[in-house]
Regions:
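Short amphipathic alpha-helix that is part of the acyltransferase structural core
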Residues: 1-26, 61, 67, 118-167
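N-terminal charged segments
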Residues: 1-82, 100
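Conserved beta-hairpin
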Residues: 37-42, 100-114, 177-191
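Conserved acetyl-CoA binding element of GNAT-fold acetyltransferases
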Residues: 51-66, 200-211, 270
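Acyl-donor-binding surface of acyltransferase catalytic domains
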Residues: 68-139, 143-144, 240, 246, ...
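Conserved acetyl-CoA-binding loop-helix of GNAT-fold acetyltransferases
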Residues: 70-78, 206-209, 215-232, 255, ...
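Short, high-confidence coil segments that cap the C-terminus of an alpha-helix
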Residues: 86, 178, 233-235
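A conserved beta-strand-loop-helix scaffold within acyl/acetyltransferase catalytic domains
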Residues: 160-212
Length: 276
């Protein structure tokens, strides 16, 4: 396996591990209400939320990445989503460009899968080089227990999530491998983010700042702080991801990642199931 293929595989594995633990954190009542669960099928990680119509929560990560896939593997993944959603679930199967075999995308297309407008995610990875110091007029630090609810609400609002998901976000900050962060303006929570630490691997996610407080360095400083904390925790591989720009649209998230020392492991295709 080439170094680039190994980086792409690592970025998928780290993301998958973070989301498996994220799903495990869901309050039982909410998990039952939304049908939240994960499964491993054909060495891929499957995320299910059949009563939450958003592809970010219904997708397959890593098919053909950790071992070569065959058409029976692909059909098993499709069948699992079909069973979960009674044939109507909108979901994605991610196609890593280093997945095997090379014609995985052709198999998907022959089964009616298509690429949405945002065709790819930039899978980003970095090592232990210190991040830059990014000046900000906001306060950025670890979230205190009394701030966790406000941080979760701010994150949910920034990502357009339903209010019912706020307790789910809150729940991850009480788990051993998760750390929560707050962005504040004059003592008020206006943003936040999460760091998942899994041995020598780390994942950054849920980073957000309320619209009216953007362009003040908060997002960059939040990313840099989480990177420093991951390195201090002994992590040697730090992963994150973002949707790649469509046409010439700006992508401040991607710009901040590059600024903070992330390199692109790969551009991963998002194949939407037929009818999405």
């Amino acid at each position: 396996m080439s170094a680039q293929a190994a980086a792409a595989a690592a970025s998928d594995a780290i993301e998958a591990a973070a989301f498996v633990d994220f799903y495990a954190a869901a309050p039982p009542t909410l998990a039952a209400q939304l049908g939240l669960r994960t499964a491993e099928v054909a060495a891929a990680t499957l995320l299910f939320a059949p009563r939450l119509p958003a592809t970010i929560f219904n997708r397959a990560i890593g098919l053909g990445v950790h071992r070569p896939a065959n058409e029976a593997d692909l059909d098993a993944v499709i069948a699992a989503f079909g069973e979960a959603g009674q044939g109507t679930l909108a979901y994605w199967i991610h196609a890593n460009p280093f997945a095997a075999p090379a014609n995985l995308a052709q198999w998907l297309e022959s089964r009616g899968f298509t690429l949405p407008e945002r065709r790819t995610w930039a899978k980003m990875l970095r090592g232990t080089a210190p991040p830059p110091d990014i000046p900000t007029s906001l306060e950025v630090r670890r979230a205190r227990p009394a701030e966790v609810s406000a941080v979760a609400q701010t994150i949910a609002t920034a990502f357009g999530m339903a209010p019912m998901l706020v307790p789910w976000i809150e729940a991850i900050f009480g788990r051993p491998r998760w750390r929560g962060y707050a962005v504040l303006a004059d003592g008020k929570v206006v943003g936040g983010g999460a760091l998942f630490v899994d041995g020598q691997d780390a994942w950054l996610g849920l980073g957000s700042v309320a619209t009216e407080f953007r362009n003040r360095g908060g997002q960059g400083a939040l990313m840099a702080l989480r990177i420093r904390d991951a390195i201090a925790a002994g992590c040697t591989r730090i992963a994150t991801e973002t949707g790649e720009p469509v046409a010439n649209e700006p992508n401040p998230s991607l710009a901040n990642m590059v600024r903070c020392g992330f390199g692109k492991a790969c551009s991963r295709l998002n194949y939407a199931a037929p009818g999405n």
